Amino acid sequence: MRPRSRAGDKFMSQGQELCHEYFQLTAPCEKQPCIDMCSSKYKTGKGVCGPAVHQCFCTFSCTV
C-alpha cells in the first residue's frame, strides 16, 4: 500500500479540535494497514477505510 497524502481539514467535535487527512492508495484499502499507517504518523491517529475504496481516512487531534 503506497499512500499519497492530501492536506487535512480541521473541524470541531464536542469541544475538541480534530483534524483529518486522506491517504490516496494504489491498492484497495485494508483495515489493519490503514489503522497502522494513521497511528504511526499521528500519536492520536485513528484510521478507517473510505470513503472511496482506495482511500484511508485518518482522524487525529490537531494539538499533536
From Swiss-Prot:
Q: Give the UniProt family note.
A: Belongs to the DEFL family.
Record keyword Disulfide bond present: yes
Entry keyword annotation includes Disulfide bond? yes
Q: Which GO annotations describe the biological process of this protein?
A: defense response to fungus; killing of cells of another organism
Note the InterPro entries from the entry. DEFL
Q: Which UniProt keywords apply?
A: Antimicrobial, Disulfide bond, Fungicide, Plant defense
The entry's protein name is Defensin-like protein 123
